[in-house]
Amino acid sequence: MNTSQLREKFKEVFGVEADHTFFSPGRINLIGEHTDYNGGNVLPVAITLGTYGAARKRDDKVLRFFSANFEEKGIIEVPLENLRFEKEHNWTNYPKGVLHFLQEAGHTIDSGMDIYIYGNIPNGSGLSSSSSLELLIGVIVEKLYDIKLERLDLVKIGKQTENDFIGVNSGIMDQFAIGMGADQCAIYLDTNTLKYDLVPLDLKDNVVVIMNTNKRRELADSKYNERRAECETAVSELQEKLDIQTLGELDFLTFDAYSYLIKDENRIKRARHVVLENQRTLQARKALETGDLEGFGRLMNASHVSLEYDYEVTGLELDTLAHTAWEQEGVLGARMTGAGFGGCAIALVNKDKVEDFKKAVGQRYEEVVGYAPSFYIAEVTGGSRVLD
């Protein structure tokens, strides 16, 4: 969607002209899954599937939200003085949370807004539509109210919204990738220290194909919080002998030597995934820096195997996509991405083989699962921004 279309749609809905238009990307994580809330390393990219917005300041204290993705909900009106979580306010709880925490941080938002939203991230796909929306709202408020914010502070407010307003115990990776994204670069982020590097992403004759299971996954209702609790318990058991706060601080030799302290087989598996995935992510960064895409692909495969057998967050749909992808010509690697339990997988595929790949994987998936997957090519882009 371009800026003139955005402005046109805004005027159709609200009857006035928008002040500005905005874009906030989605994200995929190339490798480093379920490590971000364990103090580990991640390697995400911001992508051109994302959330568009048009907005205008109002003279009163009323917030009016409209989403083209939830047209049936119409315009949702919220008084600026009432920024509490309310289930019936549906998707607007995300903007409300961001506004609430911006105010709590001392920023003056002294009037209402009209905000039009259009997203082309498939709902429930695990490509971070909620984080994309959170950062979009942050950028809108920055622009309309002339607030000067460090981008990292906005990223943290997005995470705070997810954790303390919506109630999902997620890490910081999604908001970080979306807020800090850069053209044709992956972000190597240490989630423990928030130190990061931009890693140039030269895929040569290959593209990242996103494979959507089309199985809806509600993060708050999934086993996400359960996995996090298992990891936290494993850390507390290891603390009997080790001075650590997170699993991300461990190398595999140390973990192996002290894993006997963990009193449950499942918790050992969960912790082992995190420790090894952390090492794979470091190796993947090196592979990208040296142009070793075959090595990078093998690490993607190993990541999926670990998520399937040790972390147990894949399921029939994601496994069918990844396993079938591995068998196709021109594929360097494939793995689930995001929280799992549905959502998406990604594959690194030779450009000339993409159509054959989609046909073969799509056919097999439909045979096994009973309905078709969707495919998208991921273009890497910069972070949340003002368009005009």
From Swiss-Prot:
This protein's GO cellular component annotations are: cytosol
According to the UniProt entry, the coiled-coil residues are: none
Which major enzyme category is it? transferase
Q: Which organism is it from?
A: Streptococcus thermophilus
* Disulfide links within the chain: none
**Quick one: which residues bind ATP?**
67, 124-130
Question: What the protein does?
Answer: Catalyzes the transfer of the gamma-phosphate of ATP to D-galactose to form alpha-D-galactose-1-phosphate (Gal-1-P).
Protein name, UniProt field: Galactokinase
GO molecular-function term, one example from the UniProt record: ATP binding
This enzyme catalyses:
alpha-D-galactose + ATP = alpha-D-galactose 1-phosphate + ADP + H(+)
- Residues annotated as catalytic: 174
Site (Transition state stabilizer) found at 27
Residues holding Mg(2+): 130, 162
Question: Which HAMAP family is this protein grouped with?
Answer: Galactokinase
Looking up PANTHER family in the UniProt record yields:
GALACTOKINASE-RELATED, MEVALONATE KINASE/GALACTOKINASE
Query: Which EC numbers characterise this protein's activity in its record?
Result: 2.7.1.6
Q: In which pathway does it act?
A: Carbohydrate metabolism; galactose metabolism
Q: Which family does it belong to?
A: Belongs to the GHMP kinase family. GalK subfamily.
